[in-house]
Amino acid sequence: SFAFKVIACADKAVYLHDAVLSYRQDNENSSVNSSAKVFCVNAEYAEIERWIREDYARNHASDDVARMLKFNQVIKYDSYMWNYVRLAPEFYKEFLVQMTKEFQAALDAGDFSLDDLKPWKRANLAAILKDPEAWVDEHPHFATDGALGRAKYYASVGGPGVVAAFLVESLRG
């Protein structure tokens, strides 16, 4: 949440192509294998949302706050799917059930709409929102399928247009 807050408050920023932080997933005590750390990313995004609604809102117009809440949901989707892919399989259902609660609440509050997401992300989130536990059962290898496997999945939930958009984005790197 610190990085989000800094960027949200910055007048200017410089972006580097090189990664300066790497996540280790190679030991049995890493967060991917710890039930106590499954929801760390959720806690970070809860803090970001609290900060936007309480602190950021004090000094910014309501339109800016609404834009920031929408942006938060869009990047939260990416972070949550990254987290899902890195988790041990026994945590998939529990994580997606919580993810569904959070995104449904944001949709109900009008913080964002599915149309704010890219087509394949929209199709995926809509499928998860329908029944997160069934989604895991129907797509047990989503986390390990790679780009081609995910393209096949996106075709099943969103059709060829979604696949084309996904492939174009994937090729851009």
Protein language model features and the residues they cover:
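Gram-positive cell-envelope targeting signals
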Residues: 10, 30-32, 45, 49, ...
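Short helix-capping and hinge/turn segments at secondary-structure transitions, especially at repeat
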Residues: 15, 50-58, 82
